[in-house]
């Protein structure tokens, strides 16, 4: 049996080796013209990997399936069961390498509907926590965050307009606006204020999110 050097490297506590970080987003979802269809997965992965590097917790990868409210039609999504099954796979394999606490960093609002099923995976020796970053879809904050991560096309901001792409701010998603008051309020804000790139805010927001998740890891170990 090999003796592993758990104290080696840039970690803040040996107990962090019992902690796993999972990214959750979406891979197939329209985000206007300036952001890619896998924006949520890339932002979640970027934050999760940086939190892993900063803390020493293990980055276990990104969940491939994603889900969504049935009335939000701006991409291709999967069932809640599909998402939970993939998370179970990561958790089961994480347990094999000594992980008993899992932090899921979710950057897709539709995935919040898995919470009830996700809670059923918890047990006395396995704890799973999901923390979400839910920004107005493809709008100012997400555009600015996408710039900070490095996935935004600044040239395409010229055509990144909800009048052209209905999913921006969900302005043109009539059914979603009718059935979800929060979505409608965000859409009205985008209609009133427009969408613009704020590079300074994007960098600040990214830094704040990473710092916040680092603190969550500290509190979980």
Swiss-Prot record:
It catalyses: 2-amino-5-formylamino-6-(5-phospho-D-ribosylamino)pyrimidin-4(3H)-one + H2O = 2,5-diamino-6-(1-D-ribosylamino)pyrimidin-4(3H)-one 5'-phosphate + formate + H(+). It comes from Methanococcus maripaludis (strain C5 / ATCC BAA-1333). HAMAP family: FAPy_deform. GO terms for biological process: F420-0 metabolic process; riboflavin biosynthetic process. Pathway: Cofactor biosynthesis; coenzyme F420 biosynthesis; Cofactor biosynthesis; riboflavin biosynthesis. It comes from the Archaea. Fe cation 1 binds at residues 29, 40, 108. The lineage of its organism: Archaea, Methanobacteriati, Methanobacteriota, Methanomada group, Methanococci. This is 2-amino-5-formylamino-6-ribosylaminopyrimidin-4(3H)-one 5'-monophosphate deformylase. Signal peptide: none annotated. Its EC number is 3.5.1.102. Its cofactor is Fe(2+); Zn(2+).
């Amino acid at each position: 049996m090999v003796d592993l050097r758990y104290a080696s490297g840039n970690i803040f506590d040996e107990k962090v080796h019992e902690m796993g970080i999972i990214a959750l987003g979406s891979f197939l979802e329209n985000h206007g013209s300036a952001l890619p269809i896998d924006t949520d997965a890339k932002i979640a992965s970027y934050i999760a990997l940086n939190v892993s590097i900063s803390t020493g917790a293990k980055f276990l990868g990104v969940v491939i399936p994603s889900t969504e409210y049935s009335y939000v039609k701006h991409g291709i999504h999967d069932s809640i069961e599909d998402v939970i099954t993939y998370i179970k796979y990561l958790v089961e394999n994480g347990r094999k390498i000594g992980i008993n606490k899992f932090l899921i960093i979710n950057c897709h609002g539709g995935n919040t509907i898995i919470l009830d099923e996700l809670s059923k995976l918890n047990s006395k020796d396995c704890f799973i926590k999901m923390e979400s970053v839910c920004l107005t879809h493809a709008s100012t904050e997400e555009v600015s965050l996408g710039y900070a991560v490095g996935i935004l096309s600044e040239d395409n901001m010229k055509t990144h307009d909800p009048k052209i792409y209905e999913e921006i701010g969900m302005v043109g998603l009539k059914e979603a606006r009718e059935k979800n008051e929060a979505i409608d309020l965000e859409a009205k804000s985008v209609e009133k204020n427009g969408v613009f790139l704020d590079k300074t805010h994007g960098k600040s927001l990214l830094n704040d999110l990473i710092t916040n998740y680092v603190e969550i890891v500290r509190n979980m170990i």
